Curated annotation (Swiss-Prot):
The keyword Secreted applies. One of its GO terms (biological process) is glycolytic process. It is an enzyme of class 4 (lyase). It comes from Colwellia psychrerythraea (strain 34H / ATCC BAA-681). Mg(2+) binds at residues 246, 291, 318. This is Enolase.
Length: 432
């Protein structure tokens, strides 16, 4: 009864008004699962391929009808009759059927949508919550924790139309005793920040991930204004709330000149100088996590940054590792970074995602579960964070339903777990 009887895919819209892939998986028992693939703006060059149609007369070339057809024809034919409970087999069949290193034939967006929809159908077949099923697949049944959220309240870089070079400035409500309390603290800081920006005559429009996107004189000014907002909300920076940044440094790295060009404030740095610059910010503010602090290919620079800051700051690889165990293994071996950002669609299947999380944890790295800037109402990453006891999640600000849907799912899971809901807070962050 757990066998797949039908798979149906369609083109839907993501939070940026671009098409993406949604898949439905039906089982013989009547159980059902639905999932949608997200999409990134600042992407690593080694990510699995997101298949787009390229027809400029339709959605400016961003249609996904080819990926939809791959599901409805090729993938469906290969998976009908297979047990949805064997996630590894389902994913491997799709990988083999695609036959390429980076899933370029069918697209990681097609394969991922089916992979996640299958997991949801299997959870429904077992009559368990999705996070419970994920824990079973992970080999850690019954081991759950609610993640510490990294809340992106100021957007810059590729996620906003402003002059701020660093892509994300985030708050972590480490003083909270539960996820529910952490969410409340984040929301209060978000609203306090809006008042602070308004009082300074700054824009309170939001970026792709729901954070504010004001023009500022420097990247450090973003940290300064967040400090004011934290205090205005009644919290103490460094005690109740810590800070995190996603530099997305590949986006402002000039490979020809070998420099990091912060055009918004007219400063240029070598790799080591930029790491030193980040180190000075960490001395001035309680920054406990830095993501993609250098270009994805700057491994020598990342080694310096890890040696400089890694004993006290979480050095997260996103574009650096792209949820890929082969690349992560190299980082572990060479002492590059101490944490990996986990994005389903960088690798393309749930099974490969779980493998990356396991490899990271086994090596003493942390794993931060993450959304993409182009999202949908699909909240699977909330269940992934709890079901793998990852400890941290990055899913945007405290507005836009494409972001809040993940927070709301975490609230439901916390309620479901009741007294068994574990929230470890700051101790989940590497180096803290």
């Amino acid at each position: 009864m757990s066998k797949i009887s039908k798979i149906l895919a369609r083109e839907i819209m993501d939070s940026r008004g671009n098409p993406t892939v949604e898949a439905d998986v039906y089982l013989e028992s009547g159980a059902f699962g639905r999932a949608a693939a997200p999409s990134g703006a600042s992407t690593g060059s080694r990510e699995a391929l997101e298949l787009r149609d390229g027809d400029k007369a339709r959605y400016l070339g961003k249609g996904v009808l080819k990926a939809v057809a791959a599901i409805n024809v090729n993938i469906q034919a290969a998976l009908i009759g297979q047990s949805a409970l064997d996630q590894a087999n389902i994913d491997q069949i799709m990988i083999d059927l695609d036959g390429t290193e980076n899933k370029e034939q069918f697209g990681a967006n097609a394969i991922l949508a089916v992979s996640l929809a299958n997991a949801k159908a299997a959870a429904n077949e077992k009559k368990v919550q999705l996070f419970e099923h994920i824990a079973d697949l992970n080999g850690t049944p019954g081991v759950y924790s609610l993640p510490l959220p990294m809340m992106n309240i100021i957007n810059g870089g590729e996620h906003a139309d402003n002059n701020v070079d660093i892509q994300e400035f985030m708050v972590q409500p480490v003083g909270a005793k539960s996820f529910r309390e952490a969410l409340r603290m984040g929301a209060e800081i978000f609203h306090a920040l809006k008042k602070v920006l308004s009082s300074k005559g700054m824009s309170t429009s939001v970026g792709d991930e729901g954070g504010f996107a004001p023009n500022l004189e420097s990247n450090a000014d973003a940290l300064a204004v967040i400090k004011v907002a934290v205090e205005a909300a009644g919290y103490e920076l460094g005690k109740d709330v810590t800070l995190a940044m996603d530099c997305a440094a590949s986006e402002f790295y000039d490979a020809d000149k070998g420099i990091y060009d912060l055009t918004g404030e007219g400063k240029q740095f070598t790799a080591n100088e930029f790491s030193d610059f980040l180190g000075e910010l960490c001395k001035e503010y309680p920054i406990v996590s830095i993501e993609d602090g250098l270009d994805e290919s700057d491994w020598d620079g990342f080694k310096y940054q890890t040696d400089l800051l890694g004993d006290k700051v979480q050095i997260v690889g996103d574009d650096l590792f792209v949820t890929n165990t082969k690349i992560l293994a190299r980082g572990i071996e060479n002492g590059i970074g101490n944490s990996i950002l986990i994005k389903f669609n960088q690798i393309g299947t749930l099974t490969e995602t779980l493998a990356a999380i396991k490899m990271a944890k086994d090596a003493g790295f942390t794993a931060v579960i993450s959304h993409r800037s182009g999202e949908t109402e699909d909240a699977t990453i909330a269940d992934l964070a709890v079901g793998t006891a990852a400890g941290q999640i990055k899913t945007g600000s405290l507005c836009r339903s494409d972001r809040v849907s993940k927070y709301n799912q975490l609230l439901r899971i916390e309620e479901f777990l009741g007294d068994k809901a574990i929230f470890n807070g700051l101790s989940e962050v590497k180096g803290q």
